[in-house]
């Protein structure tokens, strides 16, 4: 398939994923509001931190998801269907083995940590244990769905992925409304309902794959070489996943130990928003990820690197467009969204947006690193650096700093990790620091300077209110689009985008 056809498919898949993201993010934000009202700050904080313990211990699944997508797309790039079928079965076998290991860890170390180290009110400890058990079951269902999701993504069937995800969030919304009508302990019921959603979603992904992809029919196959290759790739990615999990949930537990569940609730709400933003960028990266791997498998380095540069740049620009109104008017939006805004929520939200913008430049670099498969040195250096986030945050909190210091530390480490990824990639693929600086970083900095500086100056001139919000949000998006058009894209990229939108959305 030609690069032009691949680009069209990437655009189509990206649009499908963005439709999914807009619906999922909108519904999720509304769900957060309802759940916060129904559970209250303390119970919401308990759910957030208890589920976080499970995510922190069970970082294996994220690693295996990346490995599955990489190996499936690689075999499709090689056009080797028999090897793909064998790879799928071996991957499922590994998941079954990991599920046993994770279950043992959670029911021993995790349960001990919950009952002996977490800061949870004594009268809610029983409910917290129920939440823990249902969260384990939810996690296992989510993990078992990953091989099927990965196969759908490798085949670039993003519309199916989007439809099932939209169904999932719609079901969650219905069950949250049902939660308001039930009289039993709502924290326990909420955890149980989320398990039901995870279970049904798993069966939907499995059903579609078995109907459409013959490779998805599991049979026990032992291939020691393939098993070793997947585990070797996953092993070093696992180290990176551990660093990412500690970067997020490790800090969440630190905040619980120092400040209690109310601060966890504020951070949990901010991270619900952050997850939506991350999903926005990840959707774009998800659409290009199979192509990057297939280009690498086919030895087409020129198209691979060009795609990495473009996706890094456009990931940032798309996220900047979405987040500019929230950076300018976060206090007004949160007051409008929530009847009562928890302490620290505004500053958490603003700093998380900045962190997400920095991270957005790194996602395509990580995709390129995963495509070539040699992850040992990469993960030791980048993962080891990110692991320092939690102990450094602990030192600042121990010294008496406010909770938001953890966000400042996170932003610094995210920028440092991006620099290290770039430096390491130059030794793995034909990518240059000068090329990335010229094609990506320089254009991003010019766009940020020419769009956000005048916007923040404008906002500071007027009192907060509905009129300022409407003007700043509308003006912010328009100024950012103009800045991207003039300074962020090349002439050929601008012409291609203009031609595409004129074709899809004719005005005459």
What are these regions (language model features)?
Residues 140-165, 177, 188, 353-384, ...:
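Membrane-interface junctions at transmembrane-helix termini in multi-pass inner-membrane proteins
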Residues 36-38, 42-43, 159, 170-203, ...:
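Membrane-interface helix-loop junctions in multi-pass transport and translocation proteins
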Residues 62-78, 154, 213-214, 270, ...:
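Helix-loop junctions and terminal segments of transmembrane helices
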Residues 1-10, 187-193, 205-248, 287, ...:
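Interhelical loop/hinge segments that connect adjacent transmembrane helices in multipass membrane
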Residues 12-29, 193-205, 209, 224-294, ...:
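Transmembrane helical elements of multi-pass membrane transporters/channels
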Residues 35-56, 87, 187-192, 226-234, ...:
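Interfacial/gating helices of multi-pass transporter permease domains
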Residues 1-28, 82-90, 126-128, 220-241, ...:
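N-terminal membrane topogenesis motif
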Residues 2, 426-437, 453-508:
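Membrane-proximal transmembrane or re-entrant/amphipathic helices at the cytosolic face
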